[in-house]
Swiss-Prot record:
Pfam family, one: Ribosomal_L3
Family according to the record: Belongs to the universal ribosomal protein uL3 family.
Listed HAMAP family: Ribosomal_uL3_B
GO biological process terms held by the UniProt record: translation
NCBIfam families: L3_bact
Free-text function comment from the UniProt entry: One of the primary rRNA binding proteins, it binds directly near the 3'-end of the 23S rRNA, where it nucleates assembly of the 50S subunit.
PROSITE patterns: RIBOSOMAL_L3
Molecular function terms from GO: rRNA binding; structural constituent of ribosome
Protein name (record): Large ribosomal subunit protein uL3
Keywords associated with the record: Ribonucleoprotein, Ribosomal protein, RNA-binding, rRNA-binding
Superkingdom, natural source: Bacteria
Taxonomy of the source species: Bacteria, Bacillati, Bacillota, Clostridia, Peptostreptococcales
């Protein structure tokens, strides 16, 4: 099990060895700094804490600055923790780069999906609309609600209009197509959540081979 934090650059396409065009997402993986190593003996579980992105020291509070100084790294914009079976080979202050993964690896990628604001039930929940003809009084509404004397209330969980998107989404079992070590790029097959420049968490797939 291993993981990195990266930033989505965008999508493009590549040719595989058979000449087939495949859609790919390019992810920039700046050097990830290990800010803390957690062990079962000390913390109850094995994990590494990774810092990503630069931030001005003036914008870091004293406890956080002490945490970064202890690890011997410059202040980082975001921190992410990855649970591991073993922390052997990891030390505080160590830099992790794109070559942590290799072509052919399967990964799970998590990010915050694009926000779409307040949306109705047709766009938000994929419901069917009513007839659009002149005689119909029902077009794009949510449908049956609280009925009459019974149940005379709207059931919890009823699919209604509301805020859509801007939530944590994980896409599983994406294949790493190419690793560009010189430019710190990770190229994966398919689409990943979020807008361009959005932060992504890349983990070893938990469903490998399934």
């Amino acid at each position: 099990m291993k993981g990195l934090v990266g930033r989505k650059i965008g999508m493009t396409q590549m040719f595989d060895e058979t000449g087939l065009v495949i859609p790919v997402t390019v992810i920039e993986v700046e050097a990830n700094a290990v800010t803390q190593v957690k062990t079962i003996e000390k913390d109850g579980y094995n994990a590494i804490q990774v810092g990503y992105g630069q931030i001005n020291e003036r914008n870091v509070n004293k406890p956080s600055k002490g945490h970064f100084d202890k690890a011997g790294v410059t202040p980082k914009r975001s921190l992410q923790e990855f649970r591991l079976e073993s922390t052997e080979g990891f030390t505080a202050g160590q830099e992790l780069k794109a070559d942590l993964f290799k072509a052919g690896d399967k990964v799970d990628i998590s990010g915050v999906s694009k926000g779409k604001g307040f949306q109705g039930v047709i766009k938000r929940h994929n419901q069917s609309r009513g007839p659009m003809a002149h005689g119909s009084r029902y077009h794009r509404g949510p449908g049956s609600m609280g009925a009459a004397s019974y149940p005379s209330r709207v059931f919890k969980g009823k699919k209604l209009a509301g805020h859509m998107g801007h939530e944590n989404v994980t896409i599983q079992n994406l294949e790493v197509v190419k690793v560009d070590v010189e430019r710190n790029l990770l190229i994966v097959k398919g689409a990943v959540p979020g807008p361009k420049k959005g932060l992504l968490t890349i983990n070893t797939s938990i469903k490998q081979g399934k």
